[in-house]
Amino acid sequence: MKLNEQIPKDLLRLIKSSKYVHVATCSSNCIPSVSLMHYIFVSSAETFHKHEYSIEIDCNDYIIFTVFEKSVTFRNVMSNPNVALLFHDWITAKNLTLRKKSVHSKDDFSFVESESTKFNNFLRDLNQSELNQVSATINGIADIVNPNSEESTYYRRLLLTVNPDADIFILGEDTAIIKVNIQKIKVSDMENNTSTYGQTVQPV
């Protein structure tokens, strides 16, 4: 699915700019699992084949992330490639930022207490104007990229560029690249209005 031709610009901006995505998978015997992942959005113009001398034409956009090969998510994708991804940038990052105290400070405990109180007060006073109105759920088909391939190296490099703080998850041993082909997007707002983009497909 090529998103920029089918969904509103604000929705595309949310998918491109969110820091994390909730990834829902299900085992072959229907046991669900959810994980929070660093990810990147890769447009059809940025996919690996566009940078190689390939005659194949791929007009799809993808969500790319890494998983550990011993994880439940990896095992689930191997047995059941149908996944759901939740994007919900529910609050601006600056409102969640708490300043760190210097490690040389003598009143560490009082600092933690005051910052904790500040954060609790912030959550208590949170109002609707500080919340984004839209969340998006993507249904897609996940594919495990060969970890020894040039494609895997290419996507790891992109992931690391966008998420330099997640190098242990991107470059760690026994990790694999997961590439999700987007099939359908369902958008919901605070008033329970919903819109659907893409076509419903039969599960793999």
Swiss-Prot record:
It is found in: Cytoplasm; Nucleus. Belongs to the pyridoxamine 5'-phosphate oxidase family. Its main location: cytoplasm. SUPFAM superfamilies: FMN-binding split barrel. Keywords: Cytoplasm, Flavoprotein, FMN, Nucleus. Its cofactor is FMN. The keyword Glycosyltransferase does not apply. FMN binds at residues 65-66, 127. It comes from Saccharomyces cerevisiae (strain ATCC 204508 / S288c). This is Pyridoxamine 5'-phosphate oxidase YLR456W homolog. Binds 1 FMN per subunit. Present with 589 molecules/cell in log phase SD medium. GO terms for cellular component: cytoplasm; nucleus. It comes from the Eukaryota. InterPro entries: PMP_oxidase-like (IPR052841), Split_barrel_FMN-bd (IPR012349).
